[in-house]
Each structure stands twice: as C-alpha cells, then as structure tokens.
Amino acid sequence: MHEKLLTLCDCAFEARLIELEMRVSFQEQALTEISEALAETRLIGARNAELMRHLLEELGKVRNTLYEHPIDEPPPHY
C-alpha cells in the first residue's frame, strides 16, 4: 500500500514537472519573439531618425534657396 501511494505521488510530481517544463519552454519562445521584435523596432526607429535628419537637411536647403535674396522674401502678415 505504501509503495502504491509513493508511485501515485511520483506520477503527480512527474506530471507537474512536465507541465512546468512546457510552460518554461513557451515563455522562452515568447521571450525570443519579443526580443526579435524589439531589435527590429529599434532598427526601424534608427532608419526613421536618419530619414528625418535627411529630410530636415533638405528642407533647410529649400528654404535657403527660396529666401536667398531679401527682395524675394514675402511681406510680413499682420
């Protein structure tokens, strides 16, 4: 009887261990996916920052070209 009870406990512990191992495996996979998404988001952010810097530089060039001569400046609006 005592051996039978021990075997039932062993089975319950083994089932619980398997369940916990599956959960850890799932969490590791989720963490990997989140890490990859974060890395991709950082790359996109860096590209967007570079694009914004370039566009602001181009805008500055256009402004300089438009207002190169003071005569060409539009009158102030009040």
Swiss-Prot record:
Positions of transmembrane segments: none
Domain of life: Bacteria
A Pfam family recorded for this sequence: SlyX
InterPro entries hit by this protein: SlyX
Similarity comment: Belongs to the SlyX family.
PANTHER family: PROTEIN SLYX (PTHR36508:SF1)
Protein name: Protein SlyX homolog
Source organism (scientific name): Xylella fastidiosa (strain Temecula1 / ATCC 700964)
